[in-house]
């Protein structure tokens, strides 16, 4: 008698996918205590903590409250974690990781709808093998939440096209619109989700038959989100057309022509990204980023194969998803192609949908190769190459992903220290434990991390006009080169002045710290013993 064996149903498979995803993206607070790219990550975390404690939607700099640069959507999602006992700023990473797991589950669900169970598993694996996605999961930034919303929209579009009857059509559009609204509350430019969805919906003849009713249903969520943002901007900045970007970075937001320009697209960006293709024209940079990071050199052919297969199938669900993916890619590419600031993070919404299409492509190629009697030379060449690249890709990418995974680093390799050093949070902790009240700290640490130091009665002086120090809001607060003589007199009068190893490490590599380097030459630096894995220095004068 043959045994039936154990088979997981769809729910069991989804649970297994979620567990694997959690194992890949999880990181304890100590390993991510520097939060992510500053000042953005610090601003998200501090504003969320203040919302949770009913202090208002503010950030604290030098003991004063200021409005944040970013809209309130993502901090509102982070806020509940700060109700937990013992929560720190780094606790926000658990919400980020939860959205990363949700994004993987939605990618799996979308690919399963497009190409079957195998496609779902392949898509989830493709997403978890994207090193940028794992990196985003370890930073207190909005990328994983944006990936989840963009992929959720694709799942809802497919479900609506395949299953929703006339009675549920209106409700499904309202739901999609509400998800778009949540995305807009997190990032202003997520407004491009709305036209991408609208174009995808035109595939459905029922939408074309009642365009106004469909537009109202879809537009409810975005309209509510824009209303909330407009009210917040009006109350905070005095105008619905003025945002936190105008407040903190007025140079780039003095006019629409300054923020968006053809020159950024075809010559060079106003503010270039680091890494490969950074500083190249935006159209080149984002094209390369989509090909090499959102997809990859290993998965690009499989993604193209998957898109072609889905178009040929001709059913409403697959066509809607492909049109949505193409429209969203186009709108994001063009919007940020003309934008002054260059960052691959802006392409994050695409990564889940691309992984789903990749999974569908590889699954279809495997099925075709399995029907060996029907194979043509063209099928063998294209499908075989797509499968081979998709097989080699994980082998190549696995090492990089493993190096970013806590379980591998800690349990397999035995690492007891964070995989990536957290020098900023270590320096803050050293200041809190070592520096006495009334002392002065000269530092390049982000101001959003220094609130606890300021509250201890320690005066903070920036090393250079960078980040918040460069904004008009802090122009009356002198930085170190402007205050060097005063600090020397303070030292002579017995006031201790300190700096930290992190700040000294960034000054030689950043030209903006040139005046600070010159001013520091007038002082002697004496190491100070601390209980933290970092070093502080006390400034002295001859």
Residue ranges and their predicted role:
Residues 202, 207, 282-319, 329, ...:
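Hydrophobic, aromatic-rich transmembrane alpha-helices
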Residues 431-467, 496-506:
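Short periplasmic/luminal acceptor-recognition loop of GT-C membrane glycosyltransferases, typified by
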């Amino acid at each position: 008698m043959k045994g039936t064996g154990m088979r997981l149903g769809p729910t069991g498979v989804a649970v297994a996918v979620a567990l694997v995803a959690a194992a890949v993206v999880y990181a304890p607070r100590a390993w991510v205590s520097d939060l992510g790219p500053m000042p953005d990550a610090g601003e998200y975390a501090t504003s969320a903590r203040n919302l949770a404690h009913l202090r208002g939607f503010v950030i604290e700099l030098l003991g004063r409250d200021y409005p944040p640069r970013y809209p309130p959507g993502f901090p509102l999602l982070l806020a509940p974690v700060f109700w937990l006992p013992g929560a720190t700023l780094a606790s926000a990473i658990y919400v980020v990781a939860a959205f990363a797991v949700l994004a993987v589950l939605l990618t799996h669900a979308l690919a399963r709808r497009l190409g079957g169970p195998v496609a779902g598993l392949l898509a989830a694996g493709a997403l978890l093998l994207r090193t940028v996605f794992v990196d985003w999961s370890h930073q207190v930034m909005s990328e994983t939440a944006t990936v989840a919303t963009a992929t959720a929209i694709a799942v809802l579009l497919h479900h609506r096209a395949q299953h929703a009857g006339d009675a549920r059509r209106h409700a499904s559009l309202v739901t999609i619109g509400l998800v778009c609204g949540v995305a807009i509350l997190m990032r202003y430019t997520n407004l491009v989700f709305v036209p991408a969805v609208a174009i995808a919906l035109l595939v459905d003849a029922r939408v074309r038959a009642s365009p106004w009713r469909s537009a109202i249903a879809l537009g409810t969520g975005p309209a509510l989100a824009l209303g909330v943002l407009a009210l917040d901007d009006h109350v905070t900045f005095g105008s619905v057309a003025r945002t936190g970007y105008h407040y903190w970075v007025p140079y780039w937001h003095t006019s629409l022509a300054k923020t968006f320009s053809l020159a950024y697209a075809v010559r060079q960006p106003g503010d270039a990204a680091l890494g490969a293709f950074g500083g190249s024209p935006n159209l080149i940079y984002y094209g390369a980023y989509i090909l090499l990071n959102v997809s990859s050199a290993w998965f690009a052919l499989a993604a193209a194969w998957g898109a072609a297969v889905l178009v040929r199938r001709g059913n409403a669900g697959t066509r809607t998803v492909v049109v949505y993916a193409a429209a969203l890619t186009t709108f994001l590419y063009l919007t940020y192609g003309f934008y002054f600031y260059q960052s691959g993070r802006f392409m994050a919404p695409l990564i889940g949908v691309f992984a789903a299409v990749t999974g569908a492509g590889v699954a279809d190629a495997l099925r075709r190769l399995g029907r060996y009697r029907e194979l043509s030379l063209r099928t063998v060449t294209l499908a075989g190459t797509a499968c081979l690249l998709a097989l080699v890709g994980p082998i190549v990418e696995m090492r990089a992903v493993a190096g970013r995974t806590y379980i591998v680093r800690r349990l397999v390799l035995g690492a007891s220290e964070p995989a990536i050093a957290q020098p900023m949070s270590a320096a803050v902790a050293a200041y809190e434990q070592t520096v006495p009240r009334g002392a002065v700290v000269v530092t390049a640490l982000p101001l959003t991390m220094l609130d606890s130091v300021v509250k201890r009665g320690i005066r903070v002086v920036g090393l250079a006009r960078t980040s918040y120090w460069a904004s008009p809001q802090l122009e009356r607060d002198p930085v170190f080169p402007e205050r060097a003589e005063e600090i020397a007199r303070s030292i002579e009068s017995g006031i201790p002045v300190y700096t930290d190893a992190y700040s000294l490490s960034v000054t030689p590599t950043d030209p903006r710290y040139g005046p600070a380097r010159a001013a520091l030459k007038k002082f002697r630096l004496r190491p100070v013993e601390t209980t933290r894995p970092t070093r502080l220095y006390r400034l002295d004068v001859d």
